[in-house]
Amino acid sequence: MKLVSIFLLVTIGICGYSATALLINRLPVVDKLPVPLDDIIPSFDPLKMLLKTLGISVEHLVTGLKKCVDELGPEASEAVKKLLEALSHLV
């Protein structure tokens, strides 16, 4: 049952991606950009809502990442710094 569900989700995802790739060059180009979702619903943040649903505190996550950046090497710390920057906007 789980295997069938996963297969269906992957198949739908591939078909949706193929349809988007096929239609992307046929759609007219819009000069005016649409209104960002942040202006319409300022309190709606899907990442923060997902973390809250999982029971993960964003503040604790940010402080833990700051400690990680201090202990990592230069290559790995760049990736963690980018993640920390993205999460800092949620606090």
Swiss-Prot record:
Tissue expression per record: Highly expressed in lung where it localizes to epithelial cells of the trachea, bronchus and bronchioles (at protein level). Expressed in club cells of the bronchioles. Also detected in the anterior and posterior lobes of the pituitary gland where it may localize to gonadotropic cells (at protein level). Not detected in other tissues tested.
Listed Pfam families: SCGB3A
GO cellular component, one term: extracellular region
Coiled coil feature spans: none
Entry-linked InterPro entries: Secretoglobin_3A (IPR040301)
Disruption phenotype: Viable and fertile, with no gross abnormalities. Lung tissue appears normal. In a C57BL/6NCr strain background, animals show a mild increase in ovalbumin-induced inflammatory response in lung. However, in a mixed genetic background, there is a reduced ovalbumin-induced inflammatory response, possibly due to the presence of modifier genes.
Localization per record: Secreted
Keywords: Disulfide bond, Secreted, Signal
Signal peptide (from-to): 1-21
Protein family: Belongs to the secretoglobin family. UGRP subfamily.
Binding partners and assembly: Homodimer; disulfide-linked. Monomer. Interacts with APOA1.
Role, per record: Secreted cytokine-like protein. Binds to the scavenger receptor MARCO. Can also bind to pathogens including the Gram-positive bacterium L.monocytogenes, the Gram-negative bacterium P.aeruginosa, and yeast. Strongly inhibits phospholipase A2 (PLA2G1B) activity. Seems to have anti-inflammatory effects in respiratory epithelium. Also has anti-fibrotic activity in lung. May play a role in fetal lung development and maturation. Promotes branching morphogenesis during early stages of lung development.
Name the UniProt record assigns to this protein: Secretoglobin family 3A member 2
